[in-house]
Amino acid sequence: MPLNNPITSALLADPEIFQQNRLPFHAHFADQTSPEMLLTVSLDGEWNFRYAKNLTAPFTDWDTLTVPGFIQMQSLQKSGQPYGTPHYVNTQYPWDGHEKLRPGEIPQDYNPIGEYQRSFTLPESWASCYLRLNGADSAAAVWCNGVYIGYTEDTFTPAEFDMTAAVHPGENTLTVQVYRFSSGSWLEDQDFWRMSGLFRSVELFTKPELHLEDVFVKQDFAPDFSSATVTFDCKVSGAGTVSVVFNGQQQSAEVGEPAEYDSGVVFGKGEADPDVEEDVQDVSFTFAVTDPALWSAEQPNLYEAEIALLREGALVERTGLKVGLRKFELKDRQMLLNGQRIVFKGVNRHEWSCRTGRTVSREEMLWDVKNLKAHNVNAVRTSHYPDDPYFLQLCDEYGLYVIGETNLETHGTWQKLGADGSDEWTLPGARPEWRENVLARAEAMLERDKNHPAILIWSCGNESHGGKTLWEMSEYFRRTDPRRLVHYEGIFWNREYPATSDMESQMYPPVADIKKFLAEHPEKPFIMCEYSHAMGNSNGGITDYTEYAYEEPLYQGGFIWEYMDHGIAMTDPDGKPGFAYGGDFGDRPTDREFCVDGLVLPDRRNTPKMDAVKAAYAPLKITLTDTEAVIENRNLFTDLNAYDLVFASSVNGKPERRAVLRADCKPGETVHLLFPFALPETGLACMTVTAIQRAAKPGIPAGYEAAFGQVWHNYAAARLTLPAPQLVEMDCNIGVKGKGFEYIFGRGKGLVSIRYNGVQLLDDTVRPNFWRAPTNNDEGCAEPFAFAFWKTAGLYARCDNLTAEAKDEFVTVRANYTLPDGQTLPIDFAIDGAGRCDITMTWQGARTELPEFGLLFPLRRELTEVSYLGLGPRETTADRTAGGKMGAWSYNVRQDFAQNTPVYPQECGSRTGVYRAAVTGSGLNIGIGFAGDSMTFSALPYTPHELENARHLYELPRDDNKTVVRCAAFQRGVGGDNSWGAKPHADDCFAVEKGTSFRFTIQK
């Protein structure tokens, strides 16, 4: 079918033509029905589809694609990937290096068009027909029966069009062309995969002659919150009765007089803007509420409201709303929710599904919300665009604070290779041709989402520098919706319009820098819209930030970057499932694995980083001494008596005694509770106090563990004295053996054999180890370069001398190692008659920092079952122990690695605070034990060097070749303040100096 008014490249590139015939923005109605007719028809499902490389290229033959969905994600599933592939870049634009372009220009050679087409039958009862595109990336044009309907940019807000004049009874043909690049692409330089398509639902809808066009629910409160007034500002078309029922009250009004109404239609250059008159009237209803049940993340109370439209007493249309009553304000330089100082314990959340891209199912959204609530997260920043309305509905219902962010990021127009390179091309600045395009994005978001109580703050976008247009946007927000605050981080880069943001917002500053800034600039509250970069094995030091929020009133929390890895599900060369990241589809330029930077893996499995988040964001801080628990209630509206406080003692991980207490403690206060019984004084004695939620809340069942605190002491057990083992000294080897054990040390090699009960446990020689597989954060601050010596030091340390001495009940073998720089490292192996081997390695050189200090044991492949006494149950690091609980834990080496390792291979799997560990195998009937004083322990299928050499998990060797155990005095913290230069905090950057020693024991 021929299409009139075809779209031209000039139109796509023109920032002043960003929509044509688009209907006015309005609130999203999740529940609008009519007894007379079906108001909405979904067009989701299979569409006919064809593809062209650019505007002048021929189209392919017709195929089918699914709506909603991305063209490139579905192309991956087709032979030859005929419709292109996803392309990942961070701040650089995807055309950088391919075509020389500036704002106002778009790619000409590669600007694919996806043409969707399907037929529909107009319901007989419909007197009007409208189309709603809920999300089209990056621009779309619509035709019905070949007649041009309209054009839209702004990927993440709905575009509605009136097709009434073009439809006819019976079957109609709808055509939508989606363009990968448009002028809007310059404004959508978010850190994500670049793709195109109809990625949110497509709907037809009709309007009854009496119709609710829009509603804005507004609230005001008495100073003590003892009462509230709730106003429903409605826009209604048609004549009849409007009835609003709220809080058991009902009000009604008659409408019917026509009024001039600005349609909001924006036309392209050269087109006249006709006068549009519709029978739309404004009508308001105000209700009084006594003792209102306020909305918060802790108590997401929602009232039901119903707006009914009637004609001659008969119901024509019904709209249901859920209303949350809450007051968010800036007072005395602090942000207050319902009168209380708020601390944002948040995450940034891109919309993502590893199989469908930014087309996220309702089930995935619900999982996200419940998962965030289960980890004490109370806030989400919709980075960096308006989310699907259903996600916001869930935030209302389950209780999450939201920063609603405008679909705007122009990072690549001003930041060049990490530095501020702003110039005349920086967008939006004060460039007049971009002004309306930018401001319309803010209007579309606010109008759609204005009735969500979860949204506390409007954000002007992300990383778009500064200037007058952004200030105008902030003023629009304040003028239209004064009951919310306005956020914009970019004033940090450009202070020309500081009033753009009601708060100081920065990204990734260390706590020390925040303290310094607030000491010098205490005018506004301070949040971090991004912090604790979660790329790879990260988020070290996160608790430092949370604790500061309770020390400095002006610092009110932040949002971790980010919630989820953006890996794409794929099948690896071995036929196994895996994940792809930037560059894996040949996409260039690319920022490679920078897209896998989340707290959860691409398939929504929680990483151990989430354990630390849950602990850092806990609503209670529980600190234990040897005799009492000190509990600080960090809730805003929940008393401590909402929790059962479980006191439990254990010895060596085995439960001893248990008691349940309850206590009153108001929000913001602290209580001291004496232990109901004494802490034991034997073995590894531990007292744990756990706060268990007594009643279910939305998303959180009764019995949920909200917080815990621990104290423990390790009491050494008496050691039996046995006769010394037998020493066997020969030309090539030294042996030490006794009943059920034998150790062999090779001259020039070191410890080469451990046999317990006749079973060989080693796969290779035990070696000193100073290296860990570099993490993304290590690479970002060039630590592999700085510490390169330590990689070779462990690999090539030479055992120059081996001596043995039998004395008292021990045989001690000393292995003297020489490192490549000539430094020496003696390691003593003191073996008693029971086969216990006390190992002591002592540093002899100058003071130096290094990644790790310990020994590496390559064990037989059968040894895969680990049980240990230490922090668990999952990985902890030197700077990420929060969330680790002292106790007895167990895991399978291969399963633990498969379930928890980052998409990009790097150091992982360590356990800190370990006192004892055992590694066994099902077929050997024997294992090897390790014991130390709060050491760092890991058991992996790979050496650090094997992990380092792989860029994807499928590039690693088979996982059943061996088990690599490492016992270390320390391993350097993983850091996480950012991933491009920040080192771990000073306390977590360990060093050795002359005399530093590490002692631990191995035994059967």
Model-derived features: where do they sit?
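Extended substrate-binding grooves/exosites of carbohydrate-active enzymes
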Residues: 2-35, 73-76, 147, 186, ...
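Accessory beta-strand-rich segments of carbohydrate-active enzymes
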Residues: 3-7, 12, 16-19, 33-34, ...
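Short strand-edge motifs at loop-to-beta-strand transitions and within beta-strands
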Residues: 116-118, 157-161, 259-261, 281-287, ...
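Short glycine/proline/serine/threonine-rich loop/turn segments at secondary-structure transition edges
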Residues: 127, 167-171, 289-302, 680-686
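Beta-strand-rich binding/interaction modules
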Residues: 144, 227-270, 283, 305, ...
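Catalytic cores of secreted or luminal carbohydrate-active enzymes
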Residues: 190-211, 566, 575-624, 634-642, ...
